[in-house]
Amino acid sequence: MEDLFNALPQPLQQLSLALAGEIPLNDELFQAAASTWHTRQRSETYHLLDRLRFSTPIVTPQAIYRDLPWRNCYRINQDRVERIPTTNASDDVYVPNSDISTLLSPLFSIPTYGTLHPSIEKDALELRADSARCASTFYKIASSQARQVKLDPTRMLEFLLLLVATPRVNSGLDTDQPSMRDPTKSPALHAIWQIMQYYKVDSKYHAPALIVSTGAVWWIPPPGKRNVVSVQYLLTDLVNLAIIARMTDMHPTLGLCAARVYIQAATTDSYTHTLLKLKGVFPALSIHSMYRQKGFGGKAPDIQWTEPRTKYQFKWVGVTHLHDGLRPRAPVRDEAVRKLLTEYQLADIMAPIVEMRNQHKHHDHDSVRFVRDVMALTSGMYLVRQPTMSVLQEYSQVPDIKQPIPPSAWTGTVGNVRYLNKDVTGPARWLYNTWREAAQEIAQDRTWHDPVNQFIMGSQYVTARGGSGSSLKHSLTVTGLVLPEFSESSVKRSSKIYQAAQIARIPFTLLTAAIHAEVVMAIRNQVQRRARSIMPLNVVQQAVSAPHTLVANYINKHMNMSTTSGSVVTDKVVPLLLYASTPPRTVVNVDIKACDASITYDYFLSLICGAMHEGFEVGDNHASFMGVPSSIIMDKRSALAPYSRTVSGLQTMVQHLSQMYANGFRYSVTDAFSSGNKFSFPTSTFPSGSTATSTEHTANNSTMMSYFLAVHAPQHIKSPNMKRVLSDMTIQRNYVCQGDDGVLLLPDEAASKISAEDMDELLTCLKDYGTSFGWVYDIDWSDSAEYLKLFALCGCRVPNVSRHPPVGKEYASPTTDEIWPSLIDIVVGHHLNGVMDLMNWREWLRFSWAFACYASRGAYTDKYGETHIAQYPWWTFVYLGIPPILLPGQTPFIHSLFMPPGDQAMFAILNNWRDLISTNTTTTFPPLKHPHHTWHLADVPTLLDSYGVYAGYHAAQHPRRPVAQPETANSESIEQITGALTDYLLYDPILKARVNTGRHNWSQLSQSIGLNIGGRVPSLMDVPGKWVAAGREAEKPPPSAIVYMFKSLNRTIRRPSKHFSKLLELYIRVKVVLGAPKPLAIDPDIPQVAGADPHNDDPWFKYVGLGDIPTSTRRYFGESLFVGRVVSGLDVEAVDAALLRLKILGAPPAAYIALLNGIGMSNSEANQIAGRVSLANAQTVQIGRVVNLSTPSSWMTLDTAPYIQYHTYDFKPGVTNPSAQSREKFIWLSPILKLLCATAAMSIAGPVREAYVLDIHGSAASLSGNFREWMRAA
């Protein structure tokens, strides 16, 4: 690649060498490369491709430049701009492959590029001209589709070429295999080069679009050429494919198949619609059709699901030796795929994939890597659709209920609800009884009579996110109610925080009109799925939804025991997926199509509201709930003797909830992508923005499956074998679901798989059953497991790489102007995705550093024309979790991607570098006059300062969002909104009294000199201020705040203090050494995660050394907490750490009670929790939190707990300095030292090794004293 290297400017050549491990990275090199990139024209990247002599069979036809006139794709209907399908598919409503050039007006700064002509937008807005409105819609939605990227794809392409330009240095590990595939054989790169020849004018390349901070600007071609928008999307997908192919070491044949699909999509009427139709091709040819030939073999784990199953704990008990008797029974998908591909003239791409697939008869590292690579071929583009079309298509659906509930099934009305008659049977009765019994349990549970638990429920939707605030205000204004305004507080007006403050002092009885307010549209773009419109409810609607959430949570936790919602995929029972996919088990993936639209008042919601209301009858009918008082309703169950009666606050909420569901919602649509598209749309679809949505769908999903397994299937299945299987099945043991997604686990049938005929009968029965109540079950039986977009095959997790595209990023709003430092967080998130997806780690690390270099530099021009520039040092990214490639004096690529971020990263680096920098310091700088607390007389701080370590360290902790400045808000308005939120929080006098008592008692105790337990603990009174701060941060920052951020960041970088945080200074007093590799936890021949194999050595070492985590991480970390739930705005882990801190500091029981009272807990609950706080029984992760040590997300799928317990040593006789041994009274110090040992070991590439504390500078006693001093000041 010498030609390519020579074509780079000198600063980028130096960066290329550093990324290869030839030379250490330093700030001078880093900043010069970043500066070069930011002044270098993007078109230069395509000239670099000229240096590669490609030799691939890829051909890009001229048909990709054909023009489907945009005028043929849009129309005005009912005064709305709507997309007209140009094919027979009704969902063909995505961006058309049309020429955009005729709509452009040249930019002054770049005349060859342009944006929408002002006259078109003016005619669309002012004259409402049909043609102009259609043109404007096409331009805006096409530009939005182009903008769904982290960065201009051209820049990402150049990062890749920088890696290719210099071969990587061998790291020295025996397993390092530096040979990578030749880039001249890359079909993706070759296709990019071919396409760009069309965009080459006068020897200069012009990308179809340039992505800028505010969106996209489009090339204005010379006469005779077009600029078809789909070519930009095609280039984005090809760049993404080229990166993934390099990072996975993908076979070029597979890359060719993907490139063919993308190119063919560009020749159709709509690129994105075609990709949506073809998204299932590559999974169908790989994970859904593996191992169907005779000769099946290999090894899989033997996993047991331990009792009780509700804990979701699993155990590896050995190896399953695979054979033909365990071969998958589900049919291959080849014929269906062939038919689909033939429709798009792509049938020939099937043969090479099938041929490669059939070579993998054994389940091993190579076969699962093949599966991972084929699945990665699916386009990872975020798909954009005109919001108007999302609403018209998604919110007009009505379920087809084959067996509706007859009017005779109901009693007379009880206010706004009806109860189900006793003689009704079938799934309706089963559903009704489940919800009624759960409601009874809630009504009788004294826990929910406690105001703090009620407010925990009521605080979960008080966030900085928007939620139909304007319609809330309008609905109340109509009734004559004037809401207070806090306009000068700078809190985002559309946020639910602002709404909560507005209604804080208004009785619920005056707010009921807001329950029927319109719901304002929001939008989400997704990968490989249609764009989704969201219905965010206002705070009053969310409040009356609380009983729905509460009862559903009870059903999920105590009755059906399904998984509950959460945002991190590793919280979603990964071990369950591995267990389910391991032969001889049979697993069926069950999804409910259009679940929101299928949950309507005609069936589900009328049953649920009636059942909850009846169940709540057992409670106190005069009791209020969440500030909602009891009320009087008319009970007409007896037509002859109707009567009025009092119902509780919970029942009153259900009355309003039932009326809200019965009326349906009016969806207020303001389509920012379509000029003039503002309309109100009635819908019966369940509101996707409700806090109840996920948990209520889960409860219904599991309840209906419960009836199927217990009653319906045994009555309708004919097969004796299947009847026997069903007799042992329950949802608690055999069905796990969340929302509309489920996994059905069929028990082993005498150590062999259930026959295909029996499976077909069962699945047909399930589909027919769903139609009786309006559900369409989308059933996938492929002998692989899929749950919540996670995949597993024969006990091996298969990362779905295409779901985390290196290039792609969602931008749902048409205004996408972001403040630059946010790109730093995008880099870090992008890096972590590659770690979790098991990319080839050294190449991924190189790519991450190239991206980090570009992102490290930013500029902002203020209104006076002054440009402010800031440049992050390279050590900033080390602190944020990207390991260095090469440090002075070390071997390249010795630091692992499993290195934690933050102070733990710095400890790991400095611990490993300690001896080298100490030696370098003594030969470079004079000794210190006074001994340093860690480095003795060596002036290591000056050396670290010269390396830029301190500058990068402190810059990393500088805010990357402009901080709301005091002068940007009126202090009186801030006080008013804070006071209103305080009243919203402490609405209950009992809760208010507890908090005040707790604060008073804590104040008395903390001021006691004899106790010396510190002065700061979490309190409910912190919450209003945190809400205000979050609301202000969500608002678009003023220019003055942006300028201040740039200036403040530059001050931090230029004049950093020559020390770390107090905690890190204490960490580095501990010297950790690594011993021999620990014994393997897993047979190295068993694939655990596709991509963690000898070709990708460090992840493989970590997985075989530690094994998969055997339990749900959510449950593991949840059970390590003394306090289960706290009010939104408080950090449950911070409360937990504060309790342990008090234990370490020897605080009396009264201090725990005061702290817990201060967060709203009663004396009885506080006493129970205080009694559980024990250092002896605390888990390592709990004590680690006290001093800010944590388990990073990259460890979450690994079984690190046994390693930390048995293979890290805070004291090793004969190895550890005796003064470093902690005394028995310092029992809490041992877990901290063990976590530091684990941090050091996991941060080194290679086998997982035992780790020991060699020495502690000063002694263990002095270190514990310093930690306690820090705790008092924290």
Curated annotation (Swiss-Prot):
It is found in: Virion. It is an enzyme of class 2 (transferase). Keywords: Hydrolase, Nucleotide-binding, Nucleotidyltransferase, RNA-directed RNA polymerase, Transferase, Viral RNA replication, Virion. Pfam families: RdRP_5. GO terms for cellular component: viral nucleocapsid. It catalyses: RNA(n) + a ribonucleoside 5'-triphosphate = RNA(n+1) + diphosphate. Belongs to the reoviridae RNA-directed RNA polymerase family. This is RNA-directed RNA polymerase VP2. It comes from Aquareovirus G (isolate American grass carp/USA/PB01-155/-) (AQRV-G). The gene is S2.
